Protein backbone atom coordinates (compact mmCIF):
# COMPACT_ATOMS: atom_id res chain seq x y z
CA UNK A 1 0.00 0.00 0.00
CA UNK A 2 1.42 3.35 -1.06
CA UNK A 3 2.21 6.05 1.46
CA UNK A 4 -0.39 8.86 1.11
CA UNK A 5 2.16 11.56 0.25
CA UNK A 6 -0.23 13.38 -2.10
CA UNK A 7 -2.74 13.82 0.73
CA UNK A 8 -0.04 15.22 2.99
CA UNK A 9 1.14 17.64 0.29
CA UNK A 10 -2.40 18.87 -0.38
CA UNK A 11 -3.11 19.50 3.30
CA UNK A 12 0.24 21.22 3.84
CA UNK A 13 -0.32 23.64 0.94
CA UNK A 14 -3.90 24.27 2.06
CA UNK A 15 -2.93 25.11 5.65
CA UNK A 16 0.20 27.07 4.72
CA UNK A 17 -1.52 29.26 2.14
CA UNK A 18 -4.54 29.96 4.34
CA UNK A 19 -2.33 30.87 7.30
CA UNK A 20 -0.08 33.13 5.21
CA UNK A 21 -3.10 34.86 3.63
CA UNK A 22 -4.76 35.53 6.99
CA UNK A 23 -1.51 36.89 8.41
CA UNK A 24 -0.96 39.16 5.41
CA UNK A 25 -4.55 40.41 5.51
CA UNK A 26 -4.04 41.49 9.12
CA UNK A 27 -0.94 43.39 7.97
CA UNK A 28 -2.99 45.16 5.31
CA UNK A 29 -5.60 46.03 7.92
CA UNK A 30 -3.05 47.56 10.26
CA UNK A 31 -1.65 49.56 7.35
CA UNK A 32 -5.05 50.89 6.34
CA UNK A 33 -5.22 49.05 2.99
CA UNK A 34 -8.83 47.91 3.24
CA UNK A 35 -9.20 46.98 -0.42
CA UNK A 36 -6.10 44.76 -0.47
CA UNK A 37 -7.27 43.16 2.78
CA UNK A 38 -10.70 42.36 1.36
CA UNK A 39 -9.33 40.87 -1.87
CA UNK A 40 -6.73 38.81 0.00
CA UNK A 41 -9.41 37.38 2.28
CA UNK A 42 -11.72 36.73 -0.68
CA UNK A 43 -9.12 34.71 -2.60
CA UNK A 44 -8.29 32.81 0.59
CA UNK A 45 -11.70 31.99 2.08
CA UNK A 46 -13.56 31.29 -1.18
CA UNK A 47 -11.37 28.32 -2.19
CA UNK A 48 -11.49 27.11 1.43
CA UNK A 49 -15.27 26.84 1.23
CA UNK A 50 -15.09 25.16 -2.18
CA UNK A 51 -12.56 22.63 -0.89
CA UNK A 52 -14.88 21.75 2.01
CA UNK A 53 -17.78 21.22 -0.40
CA UNK A 54 -15.62 19.09 -2.69
CA UNK A 55 -14.48 16.75 0.08
CA UNK A 56 -18.01 16.54 1.44
CA UNK A 57 -19.43 15.79 -2.01
CA UNK A 58 -16.83 13.20 -3.08
CA UNK A 59 -17.22 11.19 0.12
CA UNK A 60 -21.04 11.39 -0.23
CA UNK A 61 -21.56 12.47 3.36
CA UNK A 62 -24.95 13.92 2.42
CA UNK A 63 -26.48 10.45 2.49
CA UNK A 64 -24.74 9.42 5.73
CA UNK A 65 -25.45 10.55 9.25
CA UNK A 66 -22.13 12.16 10.26
CA UNK A 67 -22.88 15.40 12.13
CA UNK A 68 -19.33 15.71 13.53
CA UNK A 69 -17.83 15.63 10.04
CA UNK A 70 -20.33 18.24 8.87
CA UNK A 71 -19.43 20.48 11.82
CA UNK A 72 -15.71 20.17 11.10
CA UNK A 73 -16.27 21.12 7.48
CA UNK A 74 -18.32 24.14 8.55
CA UNK A 75 -15.40 25.16 10.79
CA UNK A 76 -13.05 24.83 7.76
CA UNK A 77 -11.27 21.92 9.45
CA UNK A 78 -12.43 19.24 7.02
CA UNK A 79 -9.06 18.67 5.27
CA UNK A 80 -7.26 18.23 8.61
CA UNK A 81 -9.82 15.66 9.77
CA UNK A 82 -9.67 13.82 6.44
CA UNK A 83 -5.86 13.74 6.60
CA UNK A 84 -5.99 12.33 10.14
CA UNK A 85 -8.47 9.71 8.94
CA UNK A 86 -6.22 8.77 6.01
CA UNK A 87 -3.19 8.13 8.21
CA UNK A 88 -5.27 6.16 10.71
CA UNK A 89 -6.40 3.88 7.87
CA UNK A 90 -2.85 3.62 6.53
CA UNK A 91 -1.18 2.64 9.81
CA UNK A 92 -3.95 0.22 10.82
CA UNK A 93 -4.11 -1.53 7.44
CA UNK A 94 -1.22 -3.89 8.16
CA UNK A 95 -2.54 -5.03 11.54
CA UNK A 96 -6.00 -6.26 10.53
CA UNK A 97 -6.63 -8.98 7.96
CA UNK A 98 -9.47 -7.93 5.67
CA UNK A 99 -12.14 -10.59 5.02
CA UNK A 100 -13.53 -8.88 1.92
CA UNK A 101 -11.54 -7.78 -1.08
CA UNK A 102 -12.46 -6.66 -4.57
CA UNK A 103 -10.63 -7.73 -7.71
CA UNK A 104 -9.71 -5.17 -10.35
CA UNK A 105 -8.40 -5.97 -13.81
CA UNK A 106 -5.81 -3.77 -15.44
CA UNK A 107 -3.79 -4.13 -18.61
CA UNK A 108 -0.06 -3.63 -18.60
CA UNK A 109 1.77 -1.37 -21.02
CA UNK A 110 2.39 -3.16 -24.33
CA UNK A 111 5.72 -4.94 -24.72
CA UNK A 112 6.69 -6.05 -28.22
CA UNK A 113 3.15 -5.27 -29.33
CA UNK A 114 1.54 -7.49 -26.66
CA UNK A 115 -0.40 -6.36 -23.59
CA UNK A 116 -1.19 -8.69 -20.69
CA UNK A 117 -4.16 -8.33 -18.37
CA UNK A 118 -3.42 -8.65 -14.66
CA UNK A 119 -5.71 -9.02 -11.66
CA UNK A 120 -5.16 -7.17 -8.41
CA UNK A 121 -6.87 -7.56 -5.05
CA UNK A 122 -7.99 -4.30 -3.48
CA UNK A 123 -9.00 -4.39 0.16
CA UNK A 124 -11.41 -2.08 1.91
CA UNK A 125 -8.62 -0.01 3.47
CA UNK A 126 -6.86 0.49 0.15
CA UNK A 127 -10.17 1.35 -1.50
CA UNK A 128 -10.79 4.05 1.12
CA UNK A 129 -7.30 5.44 0.56
CA UNK A 130 -7.93 5.59 -3.19
CA UNK A 131 -11.12 7.56 -2.55
CA UNK A 132 -9.28 9.96 -0.24
CA UNK A 133 -6.47 10.48 -2.77
CA UNK A 134 -8.99 11.21 -5.51
CA UNK A 135 -10.86 13.69 -3.31
CA UNK A 136 -7.70 15.55 -2.27
CA UNK A 137 -6.47 15.67 -5.87
CA UNK A 138 -9.65 17.41 -6.96
CA UNK A 139 -9.51 19.70 -3.94
CA UNK A 140 -5.93 20.68 -4.82
CA UNK A 141 -6.96 21.61 -8.35
CA UNK A 142 -9.85 23.75 -7.04
CA UNK A 143 -7.65 25.49 -4.50
CA UNK A 144 -4.93 26.12 -7.10
CA UNK A 145 -6.93 27.74 -9.88
CA UNK A 146 -9.86 29.31 -8.04
CA UNK A 147 -7.79 30.64 -5.15
CA UNK A 148 -4.02 30.46 -5.49
CA UNK A 149 -3.83 31.76 -9.07
CA UNK A 150 -5.87 34.94 -8.39
CA UNK A 151 -4.04 35.35 -5.08
CA UNK A 152 -0.61 35.19 -6.74
CA UNK A 153 -1.68 37.66 -9.42
CA UNK A 154 -3.06 40.07 -6.81
CA UNK A 155 0.01 39.99 -4.54
CA UNK A 156 2.42 40.41 -7.46
CA UNK A 157 0.37 43.36 -8.71
CA UNK A 158 0.50 44.98 -5.25
CA UNK A 159 4.27 44.45 -5.13
CA UNK A 160 4.72 46.09 -8.55
CA UNK A 161 2.53 49.08 -7.76
CA UNK A 162 4.08 49.66 -4.33
CA UNK A 163 7.60 48.82 -5.61
CA UNK A 164 8.16 46.81 -2.46
CA UNK A 165 8.15 43.10 -1.60
CA UNK A 166 7.60 42.36 2.07
CA UNK A 167 8.47 39.08 3.76
CA UNK A 168 4.83 38.11 4.29
CA UNK A 169 3.89 38.90 0.71
CA UNK A 170 6.85 37.01 -0.76
CA UNK A 171 6.02 33.99 1.43
CA UNK A 172 2.40 34.00 0.28
CA UNK A 173 3.41 34.36 -3.38
CA UNK A 174 5.85 31.44 -3.09
CA UNK A 175 3.26 29.17 -1.48
CA UNK A 176 0.63 30.22 -4.02
CA UNK A 177 2.96 29.45 -6.93
CA UNK A 178 3.75 26.03 -5.47
CA UNK A 179 0.04 25.39 -4.99
CA UNK A 180 -0.74 26.29 -8.62
CA UNK A 181 2.08 24.15 -9.99
CA UNK A 182 1.00 21.24 -7.78
CA UNK A 183 -2.60 21.65 -8.93
CA UNK A 184 -1.51 21.65 -12.57
CA UNK A 185 0.58 18.54 -11.91
CA UNK A 186 -2.47 16.81 -10.42
CA UNK A 187 -4.39 17.82 -13.56
CA UNK A 188 -1.85 16.02 -15.71
CA UNK A 189 -1.93 12.89 -13.57
CA UNK A 190 -5.75 12.89 -13.44
CA UNK A 191 -5.90 13.29 -17.21
CA UNK A 192 -3.57 10.34 -17.73
CA UNK A 193 -5.46 8.07 -15.32
CA UNK A 194 -8.86 9.00 -16.77
CA UNK A 195 -7.84 8.59 -20.41
CA UNK A 196 -6.01 5.30 -19.79
CA UNK A 197 -8.26 3.89 -17.09
CA UNK A 198 -8.00 0.30 -18.34
CA UNK A 199 -4.18 0.32 -18.07
CA UNK A 200 -1.91 0.13 -15.06
CA UNK A 201 -0.27 3.56 -15.09
CA UNK A 202 3.02 4.12 -13.28
CA UNK A 203 4.45 7.64 -13.33
CA UNK A 204 8.22 7.80 -12.92
CA UNK A 205 9.97 10.44 -10.75
CA UNK A 206 11.58 12.08 -13.80
CA UNK A 207 8.11 12.55 -15.26
CA UNK A 208 7.07 14.46 -12.13
CA UNK A 209 10.19 16.64 -12.40
CA UNK A 210 9.53 17.36 -16.07
CA UNK A 211 5.88 18.26 -15.42
CA UNK A 212 6.92 20.47 -12.50
CA UNK A 213 9.39 22.43 -14.65
CA UNK A 214 6.91 22.67 -17.53
CA UNK A 215 4.14 24.03 -15.33
CA UNK A 216 6.44 26.32 -13.33
CA UNK A 217 7.70 28.17 -16.41
CA UNK A 218 4.26 28.30 -18.01
CA UNK A 219 2.35 29.61 -14.98
CA UNK A 220 5.02 32.03 -13.75
CA UNK A 221 5.35 33.58 -17.21
CA UNK A 222 1.60 33.88 -17.63
CA UNK A 223 1.11 35.57 -14.25
CA UNK A 224 3.94 38.07 -14.83
CA UNK A 225 2.57 38.99 -18.27
CA UNK A 226 -0.91 39.61 -16.85
CA UNK A 227 0.46 41.71 -13.99
CA UNK A 228 2.63 43.85 -16.29
CA UNK A 229 -0.29 44.49 -18.64
CA UNK A 230 -2.64 45.27 -15.74
CA UNK A 231 -0.21 47.80 -14.26
CA UNK A 232 -0.37 50.03 -17.37
CA UNK A 233 -3.80 49.30 -18.90
CA UNK A 234 -6.20 48.56 -16.05
CA UNK A 235 -9.37 48.98 -18.11
CA UNK A 236 -8.33 46.81 -21.02
CA UNK A 237 -7.34 43.91 -18.78
CA UNK A 238 -11.04 43.47 -17.98
CA UNK A 239 -11.69 42.97 -21.69
CA UNK A 240 -8.89 40.38 -21.93
CA UNK A 241 -10.21 38.49 -18.90
CA UNK A 242 -13.80 38.50 -20.18
CA UNK A 243 -12.75 37.26 -23.63
CA UNK A 244 -10.75 34.41 -22.09
CA UNK A 245 -13.49 33.59 -19.59
CA UNK A 246 -16.39 33.39 -22.02
CA UNK A 247 -14.31 31.60 -24.66
CA UNK A 248 -13.41 28.72 -22.36
CA UNK A 249 -16.67 28.74 -20.40
CA UNK A 250 -18.98 28.57 -23.44
CA UNK A 251 -16.84 26.24 -25.57
CA UNK A 252 -17.90 22.95 -23.83
CA UNK A 253 -21.55 24.02 -23.81
CA UNK A 254 -21.49 24.95 -27.50
CA UNK A 255 -20.08 21.51 -28.33
CA UNK A 256 -22.77 19.93 -26.16
CA UNK A 257 -25.60 21.86 -27.85
CA UNK A 258 -24.22 21.09 -31.31
CA UNK A 259 -24.00 17.37 -30.53
CA UNK A 260 -27.75 17.18 -29.79
CA UNK A 261 -27.15 14.83 -26.84
CA UNK A 262 -29.67 14.64 -23.96
CA UNK A 263 -28.97 16.41 -20.70
CA UNK A 264 -26.69 14.25 -18.49
CA UNK A 265 -28.59 12.71 -15.59
CA UNK A 266 -26.08 10.17 -14.24
CA UNK A 267 -23.63 12.45 -12.44
CA UNK A 268 -25.10 11.76 -9.00
CA UNK A 269 -28.32 9.93 -8.23
CA UNK A 270 -29.13 12.14 -5.25
CA UNK A 271 -28.96 15.32 -7.35
CA UNK A 272 -31.95 16.87 -9.06
CA UNK A 273 -31.82 18.47 -12.48
CA UNK A 274 -31.07 21.85 -10.91
CA UNK A 275 -28.30 20.34 -8.78
CA UNK A 276 -26.81 18.63 -11.83
CA UNK A 277 -26.83 21.94 -13.69
CA UNK A 278 -25.05 23.65 -10.78
CA UNK A 279 -22.39 20.92 -10.67
CA UNK A 280 -21.83 21.16 -14.44
CA UNK A 281 -21.53 24.95 -14.26
CA UNK A 282 -19.03 24.63 -11.42
CA UNK A 283 -16.96 22.12 -13.41
CA UNK A 284 -17.05 24.47 -16.40
CA UNK A 285 -15.93 27.34 -14.16
CA UNK A 286 -13.01 25.25 -12.90
CA UNK A 287 -12.14 24.26 -16.47
CA UNK A 288 -12.16 27.96 -17.42
CA UNK A 289 -9.97 28.93 -14.47
CA UNK A 290 -7.38 26.32 -15.38
CA UNK A 291 -7.17 27.36 -19.03
CA UNK A 292 -6.85 31.04 -18.08
CA UNK A 293 -3.40 30.29 -16.67
CA UNK A 294 -2.22 27.05 -18.31
CA UNK A 295 -3.18 24.10 -20.47
CA UNK A 296 -5.81 22.07 -18.64
CA UNK A 297 -4.68 18.64 -19.97
CA UNK A 298 -8.31 17.55 -19.41
CA UNK A 299 -10.95 18.37 -22.00
CA UNK A 300 -14.44 18.81 -20.59
CA UNK A 301 -17.07 16.89 -22.57
CA UNK A 302 -20.57 17.38 -21.19
CA UNK A 303 -22.23 14.83 -23.47
CA UNK A 304 -19.90 12.08 -22.20
CA UNK A 305 -20.90 9.91 -19.19
CA UNK A 306 -17.48 10.56 -17.63
CA UNK A 307 -17.67 14.31 -18.48
CA UNK A 308 -14.09 13.99 -19.74
CA UNK A 309 -12.87 13.43 -23.28
CA UNK A 310 -10.60 10.39 -23.34
CA UNK A 311 -9.15 11.12 -26.78
CA UNK A 312 -5.80 12.91 -26.93
CA UNK A 313 -6.17 15.84 -29.32
CA UNK A 314 -2.77 17.13 -30.46
CA UNK A 315 -4.48 19.75 -32.61
CA UNK A 316 -6.13 21.45 -29.61
CA UNK A 317 -2.83 21.41 -27.74
CA UNK A 318 -1.03 23.04 -30.67
CA UNK A 319 -3.72 25.68 -31.20
CA UNK A 320 -3.84 26.55 -27.48
CA UNK A 321 -0.10 27.18 -27.16
CA UNK A 322 0.10 29.08 -30.43
CA UNK A 323 -2.76 31.41 -29.44
CA UNK A 324 -1.44 31.81 -25.89
CA UNK A 325 2.07 32.66 -27.13
CA UNK A 326 0.68 35.26 -29.55
CA UNK A 327 -1.52 36.71 -26.81
CA UNK A 328 1.41 36.98 -24.38
CA UNK A 329 3.54 38.64 -27.06
CA UNK A 330 0.80 41.20 -27.83
CA UNK A 331 0.26 41.98 -24.14
CA UNK A 332 4.00 42.47 -23.63
CA UNK A 333 4.18 44.73 -26.68
CA UNK A 334 1.35 46.88 -25.34
CA UNK A 335 3.05 47.03 -21.95
CA UNK A 336 6.28 48.12 -23.62
CA UNK A 337 4.50 50.89 -25.53
CA UNK A 338 2.50 52.23 -22.56
CA UNK A 339 4.84 51.54 -19.62
CA UNK A 340 4.96 54.19 -16.90
CA UNK A 341 7.71 55.68 -14.75
CA UNK A 342 7.61 52.83 -12.24
CA UNK A 343 9.56 50.77 -14.80
CA UNK A 344 12.24 53.44 -15.19
CA UNK A 345 15.01 51.19 -13.88
CA UNK A 346 13.80 48.07 -15.71
CA UNK A 347 15.37 47.02 -19.00
CA UNK A 348 12.09 46.52 -20.84
CA UNK A 349 13.41 44.76 -24.01
CA UNK A 350 15.40 42.30 -21.90
CA UNK A 351 12.37 41.58 -19.69
CA UNK A 352 10.16 40.96 -22.74
CA UNK A 353 12.77 38.63 -24.20
CA UNK A 354 13.14 36.72 -20.92
CA UNK A 355 9.39 36.20 -20.61
CA UNK A 356 9.03 34.95 -24.17
CA UNK A 357 12.01 32.62 -23.73
CA UNK A 358 10.50 31.41 -20.45
CA UNK A 359 7.25 30.49 -22.18
CA UNK A 360 9.17 28.72 -24.95
CA UNK A 361 11.09 26.84 -22.25
CA UNK A 362 7.78 25.64 -20.81
CA UNK A 363 6.76 24.37 -24.26
CA UNK A 364 10.14 22.63 -24.57
CA UNK A 365 9.68 20.77 -21.27
CA UNK A 366 6.16 19.82 -22.36
CA UNK A 367 7.51 18.28 -25.58
CA UNK A 368 10.23 16.46 -23.63
CA UNK A 369 7.59 15.01 -21.30
CA UNK A 370 5.38 13.72 -24.12
CA UNK A 371 8.39 12.37 -26.03
CA UNK A 372 10.36 10.63 -23.27
CA UNK A 373 8.56 10.52 -19.90
CA UNK A 374 4.85 10.06 -20.59
CA UNK A 375 3.84 6.77 -18.89
CA UNK A 376 1.57 5.79 -21.80
CA UNK A 377 3.71 6.96 -24.71
CA UNK A 378 3.65 3.44 -26.19
CA UNK A 379 -0.06 3.87 -26.83
CA UNK A 380 0.41 7.03 -28.93
CA UNK A 381 -0.29 6.65 -32.63
CA UNK A 382 2.57 9.08 -33.34
CA UNK A 383 5.23 10.65 -31.14
CA UNK A 384 6.32 14.27 -30.92
CA UNK A 385 9.53 13.63 -32.86
CA UNK A 386 7.66 11.89 -35.67
CA UNK A 387 5.22 14.78 -35.95
CA UNK A 388 8.09 17.27 -36.00
CA UNK A 389 9.89 15.24 -38.70
CA UNK A 390 6.75 15.18 -40.84
CA UNK A 391 6.32 18.92 -40.48
CA UNK A 392 10.00 19.47 -41.35
CA UNK A 393 9.73 17.25 -44.45
CA UNK A 394 6.65 19.10 -45.66
CA UNK A 395 8.38 22.43 -45.11
CA UNK A 396 11.53 21.33 -46.97
CA UNK A 397 9.46 19.86 -49.80
CA UNK A 398 7.55 23.13 -50.19
CA UNK A 399 10.82 25.09 -50.29
CA UNK A 400 12.29 22.77 -52.92
CA UNK A 401 9.22 23.11 -55.09
CA UNK A 402 9.35 26.90 -55.04
CA UNK A 403 13.06 27.20 -55.89
CA UNK A 404 13.13 25.26 -59.23
CA UNK A 405 9.99 26.98 -60.51
CA UNK A 406 11.51 30.47 -60.40
CA UNK A 407 14.58 29.96 -62.72
CA UNK A 408 12.64 27.72 -65.08
CA UNK A 409 10.07 30.45 -65.47
CA UNK A 410 12.87 32.85 -66.41
CA UNK A 411 14.27 30.41 -68.98
CA UNK A 412 10.83 30.03 -70.53
CA UNK A 413 10.49 33.80 -70.78
CA UNK A 414 13.93 34.14 -72.37
CA UNK A 415 13.27 31.32 -74.86
CA UNK A 416 9.96 32.89 -75.84
CA UNK A 417 11.76 36.19 -76.48
CA UNK A 418 14.35 34.42 -78.66
CA UNK A 419 11.57 32.75 -80.60
CA UNK A 420 9.89 36.10 -81.22
CA UNK A 421 13.17 37.61 -82.44
CA UNK A 422 13.87 34.67 -84.81
CA UNK A 423 12.72 35.27 -88.45
CA UNK A 424 9.70 33.31 -89.55
CA UNK A 425 11.64 31.79 -92.47
CA UNK A 426 14.05 30.15 -90.03
CA UNK A 427 13.50 26.44 -89.39
CA UNK A 428 15.01 26.65 -85.92
CA UNK A 429 12.47 26.15 -83.13
CA UNK A 430 12.74 25.44 -79.44
CA UNK A 431 12.37 21.87 -78.32
CA UNK A 432 8.88 21.26 -76.98
CA UNK A 433 10.19 18.83 -74.41
CA UNK A 434 11.79 21.64 -72.42
CA UNK A 435 8.50 23.51 -72.03
CA UNK A 436 6.70 20.31 -71.15
CA UNK A 437 9.15 19.48 -68.40
CA UNK A 438 8.99 22.99 -66.97
CA UNK A 439 5.21 23.06 -66.98
CA UNK A 440 5.01 19.62 -65.39
CA UNK A 441 7.51 20.56 -62.70
CA UNK A 442 5.80 23.84 -61.84
CA UNK A 443 2.39 22.20 -61.76
CA UNK A 444 3.77 19.54 -59.42
UniProtKB/Swiss-Prot annotation:
Q: Where are the transmembrane segments?
A: 3-23, 38-58, 69-89, 141-161, 172-192, 209-229, 236-256, 278-298, 318-338, 350-370
Q: Repeat among the record's keywords?
A: no
InterPro entries registered for this protein in UniProt:
XK-rel, XK-related_adapter
Region called Disordered, residue ranges: 408-444
User: What is the name listed in the Swiss-Prot or TrEMBL entry for this protein?
Assistant: Endoplasmic reticulum membrane adapter protein XK
- What's its job? Recruits the lipid transfer protein VPS13A from lipid droplets to the endoplasmic reticulum (ER) membrane.
Where, per the database record, does this protein carry Phosphoserine?
Answer: 115
What family name appears in the similarity comment? Belongs to the XK family.
Per UniProt, the keywords (alphabetical) are: Amino-acid transport, Disulfide bond, Endoplasmic reticulum, Membrane, Phosphoprotein, Transmembrane, Transmembrane helix, Transport
GO molecular function: any one? Answer: protein-macromolecule adaptor activity
How does the protein's chain sit in the membrane according to the entry? Answer: Multi-pass membrane protein
GO (cellular component) term, any one: plasma membrane
Q: Which residues form the signal peptide?
A: none
Amino acid sequence: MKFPASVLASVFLFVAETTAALSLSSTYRSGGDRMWQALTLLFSLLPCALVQLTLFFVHRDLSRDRPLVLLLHLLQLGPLFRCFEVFCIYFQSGNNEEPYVSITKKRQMPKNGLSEEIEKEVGQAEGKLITHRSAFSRASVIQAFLGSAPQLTLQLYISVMQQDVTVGRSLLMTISLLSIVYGALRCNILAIKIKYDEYEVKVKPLAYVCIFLWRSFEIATRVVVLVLFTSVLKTWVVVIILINFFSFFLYPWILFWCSGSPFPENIEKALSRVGTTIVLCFLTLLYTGINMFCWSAVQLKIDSPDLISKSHNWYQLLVYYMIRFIENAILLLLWYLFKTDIYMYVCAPLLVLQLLIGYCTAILFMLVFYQFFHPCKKLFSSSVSEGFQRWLRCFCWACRQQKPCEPIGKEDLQSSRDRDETPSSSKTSPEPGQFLNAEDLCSA
